[in-house]
Design a protein with these regions (language model features):
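Intrinsically disordered, low-complexity coil/linker segments enriched for acidic/polar
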Residues: 2, 7, 29, 35, ...
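Acidic, low-complexity, intrinsically disordered interaction modules
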Residues: 17-36
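Conserved active-site-adjacent core of cysteine acyl-enzyme catalytic domains
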Residues: 60-101, 111-260
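Short helix-capping/linker segments at secondary-structure and domain boundaries
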Residues: 95-104, 349-356
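Noncatalytic regulatory segments and standalone regulatory/sensor domains
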Residues: 208-334
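Charged, long alpha-helical assembly modules
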Residues: 324-426
Length: 426
């Protein structure tokens, strides 16, 4: 996707600090983060999804609060806007320790790109379609890869959860990642809230007098503030997957790591094997799944294609429409940076090429960008199906045909990329 093609269909974000971010190519073929204020197929999918919920009256009473002022103690970490909350939070935690990794590098080094269509796992009563690894895995993978000691914890007691948070921020003076529900986040637009217990934020300070906390939310354009009561609500959000105050943090890092990970003078001998291992793992995750488990990787895309052809007949028109909406929301809405993280991964391959000197990786960056464009086209055509506009004749079979082509393209891409990186692995 080129910068000039980044959609700006502003709808839900008026008056809010929350904005979309994607990665797009400039005139010279270089990836840049670009702010995007929404995409029509994505917001249409969200509209249809929200119509199925029974909380419209409750959401209508919610107010949008944008508290950005703060007078308490705050760790010195600059705010960075990111496409995906978990990538952005991990990047913030690392940045505090002098490790300057971009969002794409965090995602790529953690082998975050994936695909799964899990008919046996339900969200809102419908199969889960995922374009990345399960939440929490990114932090575990990248800290293990870099030799960083980390910790995570859940709580039965709200008071114990808040005491532990205060101890880390105010006594140990370190930032903390928290997993929260977005439904009651006060700075999210009410009309854009739904019960999703998987948002990541970074807590970097506290005002002892008011009890407010300072927050880096990478989906926001600036730092925000949240009250103690609101933070407790979102940390202990109820639902199908209760959070239990889940939090994670870095305990210590190797002394020489910040120097080795410098962007101006990268330690190529240190970084290159990490990049190659991460890419190899991603390629295997996408192509080496057993035939008896067809739900994941490139095979999973083909599996979704087969299932999609049967939706209208087996589920009826209304249910089939909701299944399709669910796929598009996972593809575009849940902080993917567009096209199910494919643009983010393209940005990773390009940056990895520059930082390791492996020029070939840039060619693969452009190839997966083309695949990302195929996913974007699929999302656009899918919106024509679930909006059912007069005179438009796209069908579920048409969409399934597109998925088959995407499956073939991704399988070929990751097999070729695997062969390429194996030539560099000693």
């Amino acid at each position: 996707m080129k910068k000039e093609d980044v959609p700006q269909d502003l709808k839900y974000y008026k008056g809010s600090v929350i904005r979309d971010l994607t990665y797009a190519l400039d005139d010279k073929g270089h990836y840049e983060p670009v702010r995007s204020d929404g995409w029509e197929p994505k917001t249409e999918a969200l509209d249809i999804f929200l119509e199925t919920l029974d909380d419209q009256e409750e959401r209508d009473k919610m107010e949008l609060l944008v508290p950005t002022e703060f007078k308490g103690y705050e760790l010195k970490i600059n705010h960075r806007h990111a496409a995906h909350c978990e990538n952005g939070t991990i990047s913030s935690l690392l940045r505090f320790y002098g490790i300057n990794l971009s969002e794409p590098m965090v995602f790529g080094l953690a082998s975050g790109l994936f695909f799964a269509h899990l008919t046996f796992v339900k969200m809102n009563g419908m199969p889960v379609t995922a374009f990345r690894t399960i939440p929490g895995v990114l932090f575990k993978r990248i800290t293990r890869l870099l030799g960083i000691k980390s910790a995570s914890q859940r709580f039965l007691s709200k008071e114990k959860a808040m005491r532990k948070l205060d101890q880390l921020i105010m006594e140990e003076r370190i930032p903390v990642g928290c997993v929260v529900g977005i439904y009651e986040l006060p700075y999210y637009p009410p009309e854009n809230r739904f019960r999703f217990n998987g948002h990541n934020i970074c807590i970097i300070g506290k005002d002892e007098e008011s009890g407010d906390y300072r927050v880096l939310d990478s989906n926001a354009t600036e730092k925000v503030t949240i009250t103690r009561d609101d933070l407790i609500k979102v940390r202990f959000a109820k639902g199908a997957y209760p959070l239990m105050g889940q939090m994670y943090w870095i305990k210590s890092i190797p002394e020489d790591l910040p120097v080795r990970m410098r962007t101006d003078k990268p330690d190529v001998e240190f970084l290159r094997p990490l990049v190659l291992k991460s890419i190899k793992d991603t390629c295997k995750n996408m192509t080496s799944q057993p035939k008896w488990f067809p739900y994941v990787g490139a095979n999973g895309i083909q599996y979704l294609s087969r299932k999609m052809r049967t939706w209208e007949k087996k589920l009826g028109k209304r249910r089939a429409r909701l299944y399709l909406v669910q796929v598009i929301r996972m593809l575009e809405e849940i902080g993917t940076g567009g096209a199910g993280f494919r643009f983010v991964y393209g940005a990773f391959l390009q940056e990895a090429s520059e930082r390791t000197g492996i020029a070939e990786l840039n060619d693969y960056s452009l190839r997966i960008t083309e695949i990302g464009d195929m996913w974007r086209d699929f999302g656009y055509k899918a919106s024509k199906v679930f909006k059912r506009r007069a005179g438009e004749s796209y069908t579920y079979d048409d969409l399934a045909d597109m998925l088959e082509k995407i499956s073939d393209a991704e399988r070929s891409f990751f097999l070729d990329l695997l062969k390429a990186v194996e030539r560099y692995i000693k």
